[in-house]
């Protein structure tokens, strides 16, 4: 691996008296680094959409621009997986800021170089590149969280961290307005968020650290005395990419089930998000400002929803991620049916449905990522999360744009909703299968430990 990305070497252990205060201070500091670092990736993820109306005025068709934008999702799905495998053998302190600076550089290029927005092919290639660098955001955060927080704390910490993308996702339109006020140039949609992202990358590098051992601290399991079922000394050894795949990812049946469930969770998440402005306008006769508010509320309702979901998965369901997912996905399916069946002319009900769906859907998105981290040993965590993300983006995101779009063209909005609701029912079934499988695996490990 490129030598700048090499994991930081383990240091001699600090004196016992210093371990607790150092651990506490570093955990806060590192959390700020991965929270704002990851939020900043969202500054340069969806900001191209803000420039699209101006590109339509230049004569590009909406369909073509949609195709160019899909470059981000396609590249991101692959990259999250491949970069996940690379990040399991890299220092997250260097890895996360590097990806952020590269993604921002692509956006600066698109903002300042006239031919970069001159053709669909060029835009697709540049957005594909940006999407590729975007994949360097999640895996180092996942690696950091499994090394610095123990299993019992992780649901809460992952759910707070997961709000970063809702926080980051809401900021680009504000930066764009600021840029328009200062420069009166629509390219500000591309370069304003990019400048901010670079500043945050420097902040993240200053705050983040690699493993506890690289700071002279004991592994988290020892510090918190919280060992997972299958923890042993081998869990601290770094693994090769081939070992990670062949031993822990490909043969892991439960990981395959949650990866496929992820396709259907993403189908609903992006199906509602991407199509709500069109649906609310065409079917529910919403004005532009109302449908924009609905979109904003959907994103921001995800914050309390994710926090509640993480808290419930730790405290109410006692770490049973499958059961929590079933609970939230069942409720979100009901909310989607109400949203679809509600007749035009009741805008309040539609707004409430958008808030409820946003509140409920981001929890399962977070849980599946967390669940993947826990189904694999911690040195394979990035690869496992990337594996489920690959399915989510390539299957779910692309299906949400293309399949839902074509279904609506041929069978009307009822057809589109049937696809999304059918998908979320399949997600519930798959999560029930995982729940049963986990219970069996847990009992088997207990038996081996007690009797074996």
From Swiss-Prot:
Keywords: Cell inner membrane, Cell membrane, Glycerol metabolism, Membrane, Transmembrane, Transmembrane helix, Transport
Record's bilayer topology term: Multi-pass membrane protein
Disulphide bridges, residue numbers: none
GO biological process, one term: glycerol transmembrane transport
Residue ranges that the UniProt entry lists as topological domain Cytoplasmic: 1-36, 85-93, 142-160, 208-261, 309-321, 369-387, 436-452
InterPro entries assigned: G3P_transporter, MFS, MFS_dom, MFS_trans_sf, OPA_Antiporter, Sugar-P_transporter_CS, Sugar_P_transporter
TM segment ranges: 37-57, 64-84, 94-112, 121-141, 161-180, 190-207, 262-282, 288-308, 322-341, 347-368, 388-409, 415-435
A Pfam family the protein falls into: MFS_1
CDD domains assigned to the protein according to its UniProt record, in alphabetical order: MFS_GlpT (cd17345)
Annotated Gene Ontology cellular component terms: plasma membrane
Example GO molecular function: organophosphate:phosphate antiporter activity
PROSITE patterns with a match to the protein in the record: GLPT, MFS
Location in or out of the cell: Cell inner membrane
Periplasmic side: 58-63, 113-120, 181-189, 283-287, 342-346, 410-414
General function of this protein: Responsible for glycerol-3-phosphate uptake.
Family recorded in the similarity comment: Belongs to the major facilitator superfamily. Organophosphate:Pi antiporter (OPA) (TC 2.A.1.4) family.
PANTHER family the UniProt entry points to: GLUCOSE-6-PHOSPHATE EXCHANGER SLC37A4 (PTHR43826), GLYCEROL-3-PHOSPHATE TRANSPORTER (PTHR43826:SF6)
Known partners and oligomeric status: Monomer.
Listed name of the protein: Glycerol-3-phosphate transporter
Organism: Escherichia coli (strain K12)
UniProt gene name: glpT
């Amino acid at each position: 691996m490129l030598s700048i990305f090499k994991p930081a070497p383990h240091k001699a252990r600090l004196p016992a008296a210093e371990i607790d205060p150092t651990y506490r201070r570093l955990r806060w500091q590192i959390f700020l680094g991965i929270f704002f670092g990851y939020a900043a990736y969202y500054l340069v993820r969806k900001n191209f959409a803000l420039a699209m109306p101006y590109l339509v005025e230049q004569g590009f068709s909406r369909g073509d621009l949609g195709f160019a934008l899909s470059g981000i999702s396609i590249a991101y799905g692959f990259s999250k997986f491949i970069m996940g495998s690379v990040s399991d053998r890299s220092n997250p302190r260097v890895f996360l800021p590097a990806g952020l600076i590269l993604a921002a550089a692509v956006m600066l290029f698109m903002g300042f170089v006239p031919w970069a927005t001159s053709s669909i092919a060029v835009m697709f290639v540049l957005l594909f590149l940006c999407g590729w660098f975007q994949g360097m955001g999640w895996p180092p955060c996942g690696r950091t969280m499994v090394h610095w927080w123990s299993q019992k704390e992780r649901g809460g910490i992952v759910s707070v961290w997961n709000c970063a993308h809702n926080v980051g996702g809401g900021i680009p339109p504000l930066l764009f307005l600021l840029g328009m006020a200062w420069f009166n140039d629509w390219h500000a949609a591309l370069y304003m968020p990019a400048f901010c992202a670079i500043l945050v990358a420097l902040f993240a590098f200053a705050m983040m650290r690699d493993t506890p051992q690289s700071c002279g601290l004991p592994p988290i399991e020892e510090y918190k005395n919280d060992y997972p079922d299958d923890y042993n000394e081998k869990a601290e050894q770094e693994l090769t990419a081939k070992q990670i795949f062949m031993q822990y990812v490909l043969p892991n049946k439960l990981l395959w089930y949650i990866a496929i469930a992820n396709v259907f969770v993403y189908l609903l998440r992006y199906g509602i998000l991407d199509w709500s402005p069109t649906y609310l306008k065409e079917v529910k006769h919403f004005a532009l400002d109302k449908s924009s508010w609905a979109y904003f509320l959907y994103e921001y309702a995800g914050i309390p929803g994710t926090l509640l979901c993480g808290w419930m998965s730790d405290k109410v369901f006692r770490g049973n991620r499958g059961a929590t997912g079933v609970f939230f996905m069942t409720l979100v399916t009901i909310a989607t049916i109400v949203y679809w069946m509600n007749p035009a002319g009741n805008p309040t009900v539609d707004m409430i449905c958008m808030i409820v769906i946003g509140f409920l859907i981001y929890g399962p998105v977070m849980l599946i990522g967390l669940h993947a981290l826990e189904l694999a040993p911690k040195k394979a965590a990035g690869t496992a999360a990337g594996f489920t993300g690959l399915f989510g983006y390539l299957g779910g995101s692309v299906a949400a744009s293309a399949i839902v779009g074509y279904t609506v063209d041929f069978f009307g909005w009822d057809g589109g909703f049937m696809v999304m609701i059918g998908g979320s029912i399949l997600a519930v079934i798959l999560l029930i299968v995982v729940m049963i499988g986990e219970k069996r695996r847990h009992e088997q490990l207990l038996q081996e430990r007690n009797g074996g």
